[in-house]
Amino acid sequence: FYKWKRELGEDYVVLFKPHYLICSTYHIPRDLKNFVFFMDPNQDINDAYLVSDALITDYSSVFFDYAQLGRPIYFYMYDLEHYAEELRGFYLKVPDDLPNDVVKTEEELLKMIKDDCFDYQRLRTFNERFNPWNDGSACEKIVSEVFSET
């Protein structure tokens, strides 16, 4: 995260929540404590969604939920070919079905963030396809359905 701090400067902080299977291997150095905040593995990821301005993810499905917030999502997949061919594969066409391009290097990722390079129309298209029922009135629809006279 030293490169991230150098590139992003004082304008950003990172809320870091690694996968629960590898979280015990991470330690944030003391001189990065005011830049990288380690999220407890037991803490609900939804808490992070509420306080974040953007999401950086790899292969996690968290982007489906986060997309509904209408905020930038960056896909950092430095090992894309290995993951696709030898590990798990995908349930979507990557990168075509994603709400943003895939980047494979830290340099590309940091440049996209610094340049505020995000295609909001692509995100809207993604949400129309994968989150079509999220129109801000879910509670109203539930109450109407439960208490309808018919």
Which residues are covered by each model-predicted region?
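Catalytic donor nucleotide-activated moiety binding site of glycosyltransferases and closely related
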Residues: 1-40
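PLP-dependent class I/II
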Residues: 10-13, 54, 118
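Hydrophobic/aromatic beta-strand patches that form the interior of the parallel beta-sheet core
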Residues: 15, 37, 54-56, 74, ...
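Catalytic binding pocket for nucleotide-activated donors in carbohydrate/polymer assembly enzymes
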Residues: 27-32, 61-130
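Acidic, amphipathic alpha-helical patches
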Residues: 45
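Acidic donor-binding loop of glycosyltransferase active sites
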Residues: 50-61
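C-terminal alpha-helical cap of glycosyltransferases
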Residues: 135-150
